[in-house]
């Protein structure tokens, strides 16, 4: 009926208390540093959990989440566990120490200026591109090795033959053949919207659905 309201309750058995070990900051394809909260392993809904999303830098800073903090976490289905409540804050928030960073104008996130100059950023962006295209066996580890072998851009990897792929450490003929086959298959099947979204060259506010809508409305967008 029109007056009905759908809502989901969090049951007590899907909530646990955990101790924070620290915060890992992952560099996104847009140069933002996103927090992952590492915790002492706990059982939650029959699964051992050792980390949870930290949402954003403001959440970490405002709640002083760092080593020793006590938090309540929950998990629903296959969704990444998240923090419900901070029971005991740390002495100080665990903000990034290994990179120079700045706050965004909104004061919610932090980002790395000139992230394009950082190898970690380039590997993340390349990995994301192939993940969006559905290339299953091109992990960040593989991309890292290809990068070190001089295949340090998306075009270079797409164009690389078997011999070139095998110049990467640990990439033997069978692995190279699998990578080459999967990339060829993905490129032949992908849509323009997938390429645009996966490239990471556009605003982070533009998602896959928005790109699909743009390409549908403007099928010749690349030649305009």
Feature annotation, model-predicted:
Residues 1-196, 205, 213-214, 220-223:
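RNA/tRNA-interacting regions in translation and RNA-turnover enzymes
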